[in-house]
Structures are given as C-alpha cells and as structure tokens.
C-alpha cells in the first residue's frame, strides 16, 4: 500500500490509520518518488493526492496505467470538483475521496479495493 501526498501531516495521519489496521505501507512526498519506486514496492492500493507540486496526481495516475499498474488507485483531494473526478475516472482511478472524509473511509476503501486486487 502506498500514500502519495506532498503534505507530511496527511502522510503521517493516513499512515497511522493504516498501521492501526495492520496494513503495511510506504509514503511518498511526490508522484516522481512513487514512480521511481513502484517496481520495488508493488503496492496493491495507492492513495494518491490529486494536487501536488511537480507532477500532479492525475499525471501520475496516467503514467501508472500506461505502465500497466494493476493495483487500485484511490484519488483524494480537498476539492469537491466533479470535472476532476470525471477526469480521474477516465484516466483509470478506482475511486475518489474528499480529504475531509478520507480518514473516516479508510476501512471501507480497504475492503472495497484490496479484495479486487
């Protein structure tokens, strides 16, 4: 499992939630860092922030799908933007969660997407 967000607080909070649920994970502060390590870490599920400096989460998602990454990718954002959600879905995202609801939905996300992997 991987967490990709430029905000270390989100990495820490989501990481703690996953640790509490006995889910091993890696955290990355950029899309480039994830893509550079994807073959080593081989996560079954990626929590991917949409808006990050450098390569955006959306561009990262496109790279992952072009590289035939078969795991689930759940995008998250502070923005409740229907157009961005549609773009993410078209690019191959498995889900979309608002950051405000992310921590409440972690168990549901794990049940839904880890069983599909």
What are these regions (language model features)?
Residues 36, 58-69:
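Short amphipathic alpha-helix used as the core "switch/output" element in two-component signaling
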Residues 83, 101-111:
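C-terminal output helix
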Residues 29-30, 56-59:
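Acidic catalytic/metal-coordinating carboxylates
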Residues 59, 80-97:
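Alpha4 helix (beta4-alpha4-beta5 surface) of REC/receiver domains from two-component response regulators
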Residues 8-26:
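Two-component/phosphorelay signaling modules centered on CheY-like receiver
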Residues 41-47:
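Active-site beta3 strand of CheY-like receiver
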Residues 52:
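Receiver (REC) domain active-site loop signature in two-component systems and cognate sites
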């Amino acid at each position: 499992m991987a967490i990709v967000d430029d905000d270390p607080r989100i990495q820490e909070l989501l990481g703690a939630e996953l640790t509490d649920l006995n889910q091993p994970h890696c955290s990355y502060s950029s899309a480039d860092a994830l893509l550079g390590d994807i073959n080593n870490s081989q996560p079954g599920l990626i929590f991917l922030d949409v808006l990050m400096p450098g390569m955006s989460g959306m561009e990262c998602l496109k790279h992952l799908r072009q590289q035939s990454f078969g795991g689930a990718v759940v995008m998250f954002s502070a923005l409740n933007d229907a157009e961005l959600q549609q773009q993410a879905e078209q690019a191959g995202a498995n889900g979309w969660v608002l950051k405000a609801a992310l921590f409440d939905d972690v168990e549901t996300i794990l049940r839904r997407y880890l069983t599909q992997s």
